[in-house]
Amino acid sequence: MAPLRILISNDDGVFADGIRALAGAAAAAGHQVTVVCPDRERSATGHGLTLQTPIRAEKADSLFDAGISAWACSGTPADCMKLALFELMDEAPDLVLSGINHGPNLGTDVFCSGTVAAAMEGTLEGLPSMAISSACFQWRDFQGAAALAVEVATAALRDQWPENLLLNLNIPPCRPEVMGPLRWTRLSIRRYDEQFSPRKDPRGRTYYWLAGEVVEDLESGGDGPRDWPTDVAQIEANSPSLTPIQPELFWRGPLGGLPRLELNGQRVR
């Protein structure tokens, strides 16, 4: 495969080990790498955009391996992707990668993930895009995960990458030699015990820390072959999961199950 133009972002920020490992692995494979990522931690910001304040971007080449062009941006992960695609890059990338996230992005957590949102921004612009996450917040040996991510993305490009397909890759926290095989997976449904811890600031005003934890992971009731494991089950088996997702959120259940609505004497059709 000829060298690719690869755009990389994340939500953990420019100083995160995961993005440096991913950018380094892509550059070591001979690709032209551009990094545009937040200048600080932006986890769980979803697909939010900055509209009320200016966005600033500064060069950050010195934080990455030689030959990598890098920018640190004051905005969200989605801001970073938009700024890269429409202002900072001279040519559109062949591939968008987001990660490696310091922690999993499994199941319905993808809806609040800044990592997935950055990749989704690439998908919305018609670009092959993949989000990559290490399924442990404490794991910091990203070299194996980075190599696997580059291998998976380039293999997908060699075959076919349908429009509107976003690949969500989660990798278990272990060395490659003890890791199970990669499999296609379905999204699980994650339930949380949502807890807010109230505190007082020095002026006596109340503030809150969100401290919820996962209490159960449920089988998905949605689309996907039933012989595919869920992404959570695959990670629990110490194996990487690859989940195809898309930006289109239209209801896929039976239309007869929708509410019967009548407004001002007229039925909504």
UniProtKB/Swiss-Prot annotation:
One of its GO terms (cellular component) is cytoplasm. A divalent metal cation binds at residues 11-12, 43, 101. It holds the Pfam family SurE. Its cofactor is a divalent metal cation. Its EC number is 3.1.3.5. It comes from the Bacteria. One of its GO terms (molecular function) is 5'-nucleotidase activity. Keywords: Cytoplasm, Hydrolase, Metal-binding, Nucleotide-binding. InterPro entries: SurE, SurE-like_Pase/nucleotidase, SurE-like_sf. It is found in: Cytoplasm. The keyword Transmembrane does not apply. Binds 1 divalent metal cation per subunit. It catalyses: a ribonucleoside 5'-phosphate + H2O = a ribonucleoside + phosphate. Belongs to the SurE nucleotidase family. Nucleotidase that shows phosphatase activity on nucleoside 5'-monophosphates. PANTHER family: 5'-NUCLEOTIDASE SURE, 5'_3'-NUCLEOTIDASE SURE. This is 5'-nucleotidase SurE. The gene is surE.
